[in-house]
Every structure is written in C-alpha cells, then in structure tokens.
Amino acid sequence: MLLVGLTGGIGAGKSTVSELLADLGACIVDADEIARQLQSAGSPVLVKMVERFGEAILNGDGSLNRAGVAEIVFGSDDASKAALKDLNGIVHPAMQAEIMRQIKLGHDGGQHVVLDFPLLAENPRDDLDATIVVDIDPETAVDRLVNIRGMDETDARNRIANQASREKRLAIASHVVDNSGDVDALRTQVEDVWGQITG
C-alpha cells in the first residue's frame, strides 16, 4: 500500500483535490482535521497553547479562537515568527503520533493513503512514495481567499507569506496538479495523476 503526500498553499484547492482522491478510493489522512481535533476544548494540546499564549486564544466556551491565534502567529514581525515556531512545537508532536496511527489504519484496511498536509514543504517526510502538489498562482490564491472565504486581503497575503514559497512546494513534487481551471479540468488531472501513482 502506498503513502502519498498532498500539499498546496492556502487557497490552492487542496481540499477539493483531497475529496476527488477520496472518490477514487484513497484513504485520506487530513492533517488540518487532526490539528482541529487535537486543539478541542480541554485537550492537552490546547492546555499547552493557553500556557504559552494566554486565555485570549479561547472563546467563551473554552474552544480555540482560531482567528485570535492567527493574529498572534501570522504577522510579519519577529514576535509572530517566534510565536508560530512555538505553536508548531506544541502541536506537531501530537499531530505526528495521530497521523501515524491513521496511516496504519488505512494501510491495515488495504487502502492507499493520502496524507493531506499543508506544511509538507516545511516539514518534509522521507516515507512518501509520491507527493502531489496542488499549484496555483499566488494572486489567484489571494483572490479566492478574499472573494470565496471572505478573508481580509492583508491577512490572506500574510498567511501566504508565512507558508513555504511556491518554488519550495514545487521542488518536493513528484506530481503537480494545476488548479487554475474549473473543477472538471481539475478532476481530469487528479484522475490522471492518481492513475500514474497507483498504476
């Protein structure tokens, strides 16, 4: 059974590609979803985050205020960069353990596993059989984030700037999916790439 990495910058359409791969029979291990689960109210990870960043990162019900954390870690100053490093140091060890557990479940079930991991270029893995990068022009990504997700343009640009560069993501790719077209064109590319990987 194969282990395939899937990554792409924010706004690139990685989630759509992930859904298409699931439709093709892949077991999806979603790092963002794992992070959300690990940061649920009262979890050990969230407790450590509060110790580092203060109770201002919590909503009234004790859940994580993601926008509050984003304001702290996605700025362009040195304090924001240090905060992002600290956040990753808290979240990533717990994430890695859960990712490995889910990969094993998928393989034990006889499925090829796709690790949907936005930070794959920043945190390379040597256990991948292939890596799919969903690529899009950064200005198109900003446009999608602002017009589809309702994000502030400055926030969108800061988030993109805090991710690996487009060039760094493309450098780790064994396969590239260009998501500048429509969903039908994307589906065709995903089917072709999946066939190449699993064929």
Identify the residue ranges that each predicted region occupies.
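ATP-dependent small-molecule kinase phosphotransfer cores
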Residues: 33-111
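Amphipathic alpha-helical segments that mediate coupling or scaffolding at interfaces
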Residues: 9, 52, 72, 90, ...
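Small-molecule kinase domains that catalyze NTP-dependent phosphoryl transfer to phosphate-bearing small molecules
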Residues: 126-127, 147, 151-199
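An amphipathic alpha-helix signature
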Residues: 24, 46-50, 138-146, 153, ...
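Well-ordered beta-strand positions
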Residues: 27, 33, 130, 174-175
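Walker A (P-loop) phosphate-binding motif
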Residues: 1-26, 31-33
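Short, acidic/turn-prone active-site loops that include or flank metal/cofactor-
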Residues: 33-36, 137-139, 161, 183
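ATP-dependent NMP and nucleoside kinases share a basic, alpha-helical "lid"
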Residues: 100-108, 112-148
